Design a protein with these regions (language model features):
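Short, small-residue-enriched loops and turns at beta-alpha junctions
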Residues: 1-6, 82, 95, 122-127, ...
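Alpha-helix-loop-beta-strand connector modules within alpha/beta enzyme cores
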Residues: 3-25, 59-77, 126-153, 211, ...
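Structural motif corresponding to alpha-helix initiation and N-cap regions
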Residues: 10, 33, 56-57, 97-101, ...
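Catalytic cores of alpha/beta
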Residues: 20-25, 30-47, 132-171
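Glycine- and other small-residue-rich loops at beta-strand/loop junctions that grip anionic moieties
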Residues: 28-29, 49-52, 96, 118, ...
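Conserved anion-binding
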Residues: 44-122
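Short gly/pro/ser/thr-enriched loop/turn and capping motifs at secondary-structure boundaries
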Residues: 54-56, 81, 153, 176-179
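C-terminal helical cap(s) of enzyme catalytic domains, especially alpha/beta-barrels
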Residues: 60-67, 159-220
């Protein structure tokens, strides 16, 4: 679906931007320069693009030309296939046929400022990030890398920033399950990883939460 077919997304961005005081990056359904303009006008600081960039790489340079490289994050979803790291889209469902090493070099060449590097194999498992993948991409590009997928403890977050050549880390399950729900018995290994995505099961362990409630939980 396009950005405008997603009911209330722009309003949600506006509301969120008013309630938080940290940089806001928005992704999902962004396919054109017009979509980028609408999201930034709604209050986002950056946009994150994946599928549209793979389908039409020149969109990267178009966005950079108008809004600058610091505004654009390119999401790169990766699955290891026969010992080769390959690029996927659609939450790890669509094989693009692109090698990660080739794609990240192209992303940098076209001017994007950051790469959100997701190991779909590790995502939601808490088994730690894929250091081999990170090293591969780091040796290919000089732009900022946000590592994502597999972070399972706060100690690992400390280690990432003190011992690895990475600029930022994206954390989801660790906050959702440990900080917000504090569920010691939740089997995180089956939520969010590749097998879970392909099974089409629902995330029964998650509950809806408002932005305000989330902020209050994080403060407590």
């Amino acid at each position: 679906a396009s950005l405008y077919e997603r009911n209330g997304l722009i309003e949600l961005i506006k509301k969120t931007a008013k309630e938080i005081f940290i940089p806001l990056t928005v992704g999902g359904g962004i396919r054109s320069l017009e979509d980028v303009a609408a999201i930034l006008a709604a209050g986002a600081d950056r946009v994150c693009i994946n599928t549209a960039a793979v389908q039409r790489p020149e969109l990267i340079s178009e966005v950079v030309k108008v809004y600058g490289s610091s505004t654009l994050v390119i999401a790169v979803e990766v699955i290891k296939v026969s010992e080769e790291y390959m690029v996927f889209t659609d939450n790890g469902r669509e094989h693009t046929g692109l090698k990660v090493s080739d794609w990240v070099k192209k992303i940098e060449e076209l001017g994007a400022g950051e790469i959100l590097l997701t190991s779909v194999d590790r995502e939601g498992t808490g088994r730690g990030i894929d250091i081999e993948l990170l090293d591969l991409v780091r040796n290919c590009v000089d732009i900022s890398i946000i590592v994502h997928g597999g972070i399972g403890s706060y100690e690992e977050v400390f280690n990432i920033f003190h011992n690895l050549d990475v600029d930022a880390a994206c954390i989801a399950s660790l906050f959702h399950y440990d900080t917000i729900y504090s569920s010691e018995n939740l089997d995180r290994s089956v939520l969010g990883n590749k097998s879970f995505l392909l099974s089409n099961k629902k995330r029964s362990g998650l509950e809806s939460i408002s932005v305000k409630s989330l902020k209050d939980k994080l403060k407590s």
